[in-house]
């Protein structure tokens, strides 16, 4: 093999090993519409001037965010989507990406190259994994209809403009650890890619309960957010209505008592009719016996008449 080829291969292997050994991987997080920090810490900065280096960042699609070429910003190779959105901190070797959007999530590479008279040598590569978060709005409970005597309560809870996708939303009610909710819905904005969530609940006052407190809870991967508590009080009956109900109840009770007395009074009189019939039969029997006795005395009466004459 040609010695020059051998030397070239050795240099290539050396540069590759150097690149792998000096590769750095970091994770960073930014808020939606905020600023992301993409570090590129250079351990050899004390020995090499920035004017001797080429430093640039590119995204996972190989689009250039920023390039610092031998001490000067170079905008020719910067992609249009990143123009005006970046600033370079020379002291910390960090690129600031402004106005971060959900679509900016992903991996970014920073390359530091030395520019010798011929060619270039990669001195360091830093891989940054960027995640973007957006705080959901505080859950808000809205009443769908007014609370009246025995009517149900229809509630809706909403929270908007958050990221990443929420896990769930539910209602909590006084003195209960159960999670309530009838219809949880999650939607995502096509432009901002932020999520909104809502849930609804229909409930009524249990018997004997006059007060209830309801709270809506949004649960994400990292936190729980609660709404302001909403208090409900069922209206007590007015005094006039109360006394009307009492009067009606007492009247019904008296009518029932009177009806019961009448029924009980009639039952013992029913068997008295046969006793009247029996006494009549007894009187008829006595009359018959008297008739029979008179017939037996007729001969005696007849014989006594001549003597009397």
From Swiss-Prot:
It comes from the Eukaryota. Residues 150-223 form the Ig-like C2-type domain. Residues 269-279 have a biased composition (Polar residues). The chain crosses the membrane at residues 245-265. Disulfide bonds join 40-110, 157-216. Residues 269-309 are annotated as: Disordered. Its main location: membrane. Residues 1-23 form the signal peptide. Residues 266-309 are cytoplasmic. Residues 280-298 have a biased composition (Basic and acidic residues). Expressed on activated B-cells. It is a single-pass type I membrane protein. It is found in: Cell membrane. Residues 33-128 form the Ig-like V-type domain. Glycans are attached at residues 33, 47, 92, 135, 146, 154, 175, 190, 231. GO terms for biological process: adaptive immune response; B cell activation; cellular response to lipopolysaccharide; defense response to virus; positive regulation of immunoglobulin production; positive regulation of non-canonical NF-kappaB signal transduction; positive regulation of T cell proliferation; toll-like receptor 3 signaling pathway. This is T-lymphocyte activation antigen CD86.
């Amino acid at each position: 093999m040609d010695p020059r080829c051998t030397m070239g291969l050795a240099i290539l292997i050396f540069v590759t090993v150097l690149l792998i050994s000096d590769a750095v991987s970091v994770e960073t997080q930014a808020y939606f519409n905020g600023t992301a920090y993409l570090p590129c810490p250079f351990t050899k900065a004390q020995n090499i001037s920035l004017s001797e280096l080429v430093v640039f960042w590119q995204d996972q699609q190989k689009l250039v965010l920023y390039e610092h070429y031998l001490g000067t910003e170079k905008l020719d190779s910067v992609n249009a989507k990143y123009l005006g959105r970046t600033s370079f901190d020379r002291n910390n070797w960090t690129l600031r990406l402004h106005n971060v959007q959900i679509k900016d999530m992903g991996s970014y590479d920073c390359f530091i190259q030395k520019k010798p008279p011929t060619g270039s040598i990669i001195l360091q590569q830093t891989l940054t994994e960027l995640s973007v978060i957006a705080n959901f709005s505080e859950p808000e409970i809205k009443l769908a209809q007014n609370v009246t005597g025995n009517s149900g309560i229809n509630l809706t809870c909403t929270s908007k403009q958050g990221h990443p996708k929420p896990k769930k939303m539910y209602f909590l009610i006084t003195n209960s650890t159960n999670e309530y909710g009838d219809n949880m819905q999650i939607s995502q904005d096509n432009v901002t890619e932020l999520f909104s969530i809502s849930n609804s609940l229909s409930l009524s006052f249990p018997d004997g309960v006059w007060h209830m407190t309801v709270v809506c809870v949004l649960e994400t991967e990292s936190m729980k957010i609660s709404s302001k508590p909403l208090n409900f009080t069922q209206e007590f009956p007015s005094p006039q209505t109360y006394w009307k109900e009492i009067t009606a109840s007492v009247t019904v009770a008296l009518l029932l008592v009177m009806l019961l007395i009448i029924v009980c009074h009639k039952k013992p009189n029913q068997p008295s009719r046969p006793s009247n019939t029996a006494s009549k039969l007894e009187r008829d029997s006595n009359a018959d016996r008297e008739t029979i006795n008179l017939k037996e005395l007729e001969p005696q009466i007849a014989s006594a008449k001549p003597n009397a004459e």
